[in-house]
Amino acid sequence: MKTIVYLIVSILLLSSTVLVLAEGNAASHELQEYPIEEQRKCVDGSCDPYSSDAPPCCDNQICQCIFFVPCYCKYRGK
């Protein structure tokens, strides 16, 4: 009897795990359908390198932070 109960519980756990993984793959696939430029517009001015949600600097610019001055985008090599 314990074996049957164990088998049923194992099947239920396995099927729920498969469903969760399938939903996660579907969600990540939806994000990949749109290019990064459409998800987050770039900025030409102030930037925030410490936030993963902040948009990146445009083109060949980098985000530069100097002490207490707010961070800003500047062209590489200038």
From Swiss-Prot:
The intrachain disulfides are C42-C58, C47-C63, C57-C73, C65-C71
- Alphabetically ordered keywords of this record: Amidation, Disulfide bond, Ion channel impairing toxin, Knottin, Neurotoxin, Secreted, Signal, Toxin, Voltage-gated sodium channel impairing toxin
- Major localization class: secreted
Kindly indicate whether the keyword Mitochondrion belongs to this entry. no
Any chance you could tell me the propeptide residue ranges? 23-40
* Gene Ontology cellular component list: extracellular region
Span of the secretion signal?
A: 1-22
Modified-residue entries (Arginine amide), positions: R76
The entry sums up its family as follows: Belongs to the rTX family.
Q: Which purpose does this protein serve, as stated in its record?
A: Agonist of rat Nav1.3/SCN3A. This toxin increases the peak current amplitude, and potently inhibits the fast inactivation of the channel (EC(50)=120 nM). The inhibition of fast inactivation is voltage-independent (depolarizing voltages ranging from 220 mV to 130 mV). The toxin might bind to the domain IV of the Nav1.3 channel, while domain II might not participate in interacting with the toxin but could determine the efficacy of RTX-VII. In vivo, when intracerebroventricularly injected into mice, the toxin causes involuntary body twitching (seizure-like symptoms).
Put simply, this protein is called RTX-VII
Species the sequence originates in: Macrothele raveni
